[in-house]
Amino acid sequence: MALLQFGGTLAPKLGEKPQLLPRSPALTRVIYADPRFLVSKSGSGGRLKHLVSPTASLQSRTSSRLFNHAPSPRFRHRRSSRFIVRADADFYSTLGVSRNASKSEIKSAYRKLARSYHPDVNKDPGAEQKFKDISNAYEVLSDDEKRSIYDKYGEAGLKGAGMGTGDYSNPFDLFESLFEGFGGMGGMGGRAARNRPMQGDDEAYNLVLNFKEAVFGVEKEIEITRLEGCNTCDGTGAKPGTKPTTCKTCGGQGQVVSSTRTPLGIFQQVSTCNTCGGTGEFSTPCNTCGGDGRVRKTKRISLKVPAGVDSGSRLRVRSEGNAGRRGGPPGDLYVFIDVLSDPVLKRDGTNILYTCKVSYIDAILGTTVKVPTVDGMVDLKIPSGTQPGTTLVMSKKGVPLLGKSNARGDQLVRVQVEIPKRLSSDERKLIEELANLNKAQTANSRR
């Protein structure tokens, strides 16, 4: 590694000549590329504090302001007017370990964080970037040579020595290589995991029942449309007679890494390969299913609806949903119940409500009336002296308890006493006689 002399300072040459922004004969600042680092020297007695990559120019208004104005709170003041801008990334902080941590401690910290932030487990928007940062940090700190250079010169020193982070074409490679032999991660990452059989999606069906069907249950034949395995390709999605090849877009990884250069450095984003859909393989698609391995078909199935369901009830029929991919198990069928209302009977949980109208004469003298129930017409005795609004209970005439057909609710009958607005002369005469009799009885009771 060549050394360049600038005044009283020797600076290693990391690929290109450092840029000089002299402000005065007594103050010379050596600037290297990574915008996160500024290397400064004041006077002839100063010494080089950090090495960084020479890829960015500070010949701009932004850079000029750095030297012509007071430093921001991010700058740490030193003697002899020296200042240092620290890098935002710290591999030790990323893994949550101290700078003197052992390799086993670093490995343990990485495994714990990688499990938490792996995109297959953590769906937060920033989890994928966090996972990449963790992988980069572990890649450096787990290698003795890289760690030594990083401790001395930072990340830029690794770049200058041709040992930058990102040696793995995909951060998932590092993750998989570390967890290989530990029983896997339950389907997290990796082409093998992404090629595993996948369970099919659930299918939904809306079923409308009348009032009595919901109360007592019914057996219905329904017609559903769902995805079933393609018979032409046996569910592989590949054209018969052809063999899958490694995807050229992702190199068989199932994921691609896109890099974007910004003023703050190079940002990388990992995404599923659009060419192979994350499988890492490319096949000539089947002419029947278009490469999906499944086709949509219609099927009639017999459904037994239990007694006691209500609007909003959901029935689950196992393995009657959409077929899985690559030979995976099918999903389930969920049947959502909607119950039509009855014009006479109302439902309240497992109880049935009914309003019975009786004349004031029947309410006074008592009577027997026929009342509609889910079991048919039933005689109900109205006791004499029944008051308006009285509720009579017809035991076990309600809705069966869902899952326990031998247990039923009640039918609650609310008595509505009808008082006539008009009376005949004979009716009025009789009621007046009754009123006079009532007055006489009241007067006698007060004596």
From Swiss-Prot:
- InterPro entries from the UniProt entry: DnaJ, DnaJ_C, DnaJ_domain, DnaJ_domain_CS, HSP40/DnaJ_pept-bd, HSP_DnaJ_Cys-rich_dom, HSP_DnaJ_Cys-rich_dom_sf, J_dom_sf
The set of disulfide-linked cysteines is: none
Cellular component, GO annotation: chloroplast; cytoplasm; endoplasmic reticulum
Mark the CR-type zinc finger spans by residue number. 217-298
Query: Transit peptide extent?
Result: 1-86
Residue span, J domain: 90-154
Q: What is its main location?
A: plastid
Signals that turn on the gene: Induced by UV and hydrogen peroxide. Down-regulated during sucrose starvation. Transiently down-regulated by heat shock.
What keywords appear on the UniProt entry? Chloroplast, Metal-binding, Plastid, Repeat, Transit peptide, Zinc, Zinc-finger
Question: Which Pfam family, an example, fits this chain?
Answer: DnaJ_C
Q: Name one GO molecular function term.
A: unfolded protein binding
Location comes to: Plastid, Chloroplast
PROSITE patterns named among the record's database cross-references: DNAJ_1, DNAJ_2, ZF_CR
Please report the name of this protein according to its UniProt entry.
Chaperone protein dnaJ A7A, chloroplastic
